[in-house]
């Protein structure tokens, strides 16, 4: 049987298939469909210091090759997560990664410090790239020097592995990744959803509760794949590929492009066992190709 284990920083993953934040709830919601022990890791829904109500409905609109969402980072807050959700997750033999955010940099630091002290949380994913927040909040992921300051200050306060989730709508995503690396991030995940909109031609208003949302699903996969390939060449820290992955073939493309691991997002809504099928598909590919260790194909793209 081929070896599927990969390492991100000092953290080992039994396989490179993780869930994407915001598409797998807090794990409990999918536990009736998926044996969570099988997964390489679970990235839970983005958490803030206090509960957030999120954006007004409607929040989701299906597109021909994906969907536009405007959830607005609704969540139960850090303390409720620790009391109500984390005890369940700790029962499983898989890595728990908490995606987190703040309304300002001080709040980012506060959430990160509390998560760093929380038993059962293996790594943190810092969300600096959600398109469904105010422009002031979003600047951190779009402006190099603001990103640098944010990573530097958060890193000072935590010891656990830090993953930074990058925005696609920047001029040089490789530059942003290098900044993360220089300031001590252990890995980068990319890409987040792409800012998008949809209009009702009769009312001439947005068909979601906000003016714009974030596009995800197969429509963004080629964009994400190119970004992963570009970033993987620019940094030495691990890259986690995200964006439109629905099959083992999709996942393998990201690994070949240089991703150390991948996250499955929108596919979970369509097929609750997508992650398991992708893991099995990767395993079968390696057997058929007589590849003993998945690390042999990571970054094996030929120009």
Curated annotation (Swiss-Prot):
- Biological pathway: Pyrimidine metabolism; UMP biosynthesis via de novo pathway; orotate from (S)-dihydroorotate (NAD(+) route): step 1/1
Top-level taxon: Bacteria
Q: What cofactor does this protein call for?
A: FMN
The record's annotation in InterPro entries points to: Aldolase_TIM (IPR013785), DHO_dehydrogenase (IPR050074), DHOD_1B (IPR033888), Dihydroorotate_DH_1 (IPR024920), Dihydroorotate_DH_1_2 (IPR012135), Dihydroorotate_DH_cat (IPR005720), Dihydroorotate_DH_CS (IPR001295), Dihydroorotate_DH_I (IPR049622)
The UniProt record lists the EC number as 1.3.1.14
| Compartment annotation | Cytoplasm
Give the cofactor note text: Binds 1 FMN per subunit.
Its primary localisation, in coarse terms, equals cytoplasm
Gene Ontology biological-process entries: 'de novo' pyrimidine nucleobase biosynthetic process; 'de novo' UMP biosynthetic process
Membrane-crossing ranges are none
Catalytic activity reported: (S)-dihydroorotate + NAD(+) = orotate + NADH + H(+)
Q: Which region is the signal sequence? A: none
One GO cellular component assignment for this chain's record is: cytoplasm
Q: What positions does UniProt annotate as the active site of this protein?
A: 130
Keywords attached to this entry? Cytoplasm, Flavoprotein, FMN, NAD, Oxidoreductase, Pyrimidine biosynthesis
Top EC class, one word: oxidoreductase
Gene Ontology terms for molecular function: dihydroorotate dehydrogenase (NAD+) activity; dihydroorotate dehydrogenase activity
Provide the residue positions that the database annotates as binding substrate.
45, 69-73, 127, 192-193
Q: How does it assemble?
A: Heterotetramer of 2 PyrK and 2 PyrD type B subunits.
Question: What family name appears in the similarity comment?
Answer: Belongs to the dihydroorotate dehydrogenase family. Type 1 subfamily.
HAMAP family reported in the protein's UniProt record? DHO_dh_type1 (MF_00224)
Q: What does this protein do?
A: Catalyzes the conversion of dihydroorotate to orotate with NAD(+) as electron acceptor.
Which NCBIfam families does its entry note?
PRK07259.1, pyrD_sub1_fam
Descriptive protein name: Dihydroorotate dehydrogenase B (NAD(+)), catalytic subunit
The species this protein was found in: Thermodesulfovibrio yellowstonii (strain ATCC 51303 / DSM 11347 / YP87)
Per the UniProt record, the lineage of the source organism begins with: Bacteria, Pseudomonadati, Nitrospirota, Thermodesulfovibrionia, Thermodesulfovibrionales
